[in-house]
Amino acid sequence: MAGRELSHLQQLEAESIQIIREVAAEFDNPVMLYSIGKDSSVMLHLARKAFYPGKIPFPLLHVDTGWKFKEMIAFRDAQAKKFGFELLTHTNPEGVAQGINPFDHGSAKHTDIMKTQGLKQALNQYGFDAAFGGARRDEEKSRAKERVYSFRDRHHRWDPKNQRPELWRTYNGAVNKGESIRVFPLSNWTELDIWQYIYQENIELVPLYFAAERPVVERGGQLIMADDERMKLEEGETIKHEVVRFRTLGCYPLTAAMHSQADNLEKIIEEMLLTRSSERQGRLIDSDQSASMEQKKRQGYF
């Protein structure tokens, strides 16, 4: 009797679960990076499936810059309580002591100190030798050339010219002492795949992904949400209430919203079928300088 043919989403799911299980078996101290966004939510769902009915055998790590949306932090804590996974959080204490913030220090310095350096501190503190991330190849050109097993040196730096071939989905996890890998189980997924899988599996998401009336400021052609009293208005700016949603999430002063009426999953998927723009157009950190994402990754970014 012929086996049942898997659908496109089932094939992606099976591939991701196999990668997660392989890393859990092969590495001594893996961790899953949890940014609280839609891709992290899908990756968490896949990890739960991979080890069901047991618990996820590694912790989740959130590098908290102190500038995430309030709804993201509330959602993070609710998910940890609901599913009972081990949640680690880390904030760069040196950055906090220096008062680093995206308004006074700019996106490049804020991202480097609070995200990149904060991540490296946490990885060193706990001695993780493999870190799962939710990046996808369709997101951005530097991520398009990254391997599923992305090797990092003892300083967590990425050298795109010094990576291993992954023929026939065979992964080489051998690392020298002090080295590590970043693992991307969602590498072959697209943004549309993610949304269709969320719909199929009924995965919970931060409400910010759905259209609602929110307080925003128009700055440089982008809509920035005034999430708390720390929002610094520039001359001539006023806060307006408009119906918007977020296609991608990060630190609130560095993440732009978009006008949208998509307040449920069906409408978001319909919107995705029609859009021709990149989901990362709302991430202000990507416009710091030419090839900024690749430079950040070379320095140890997610």
From Swiss-Prot:
The primary gene name is cysD
Q: Which residues are listed as membrane-spanning?
A: none
User: What organism does this protein naturally occur in?
Assistant: Shewanella sp. (strain ANA-3)
Which EC number(s) are documented for this chain?
A: 2.7.7.4
Q: Where are the residues of the annotated region Disordered?
A: 280-302
Say if the entry is tagged with keyword Nucleotide-binding.
yes
Q: Which CDD domains match?
A: Sulfate_adenylyltransferase_2
Q: Which one GO biological process term can you cite for this protein?
A: sulfate assimilation
Quote the protein name from its UniProt record.
Answer: Sulfate adenylyltransferase subunit 2
* Record flagged with keyword Transmembrane helix: no
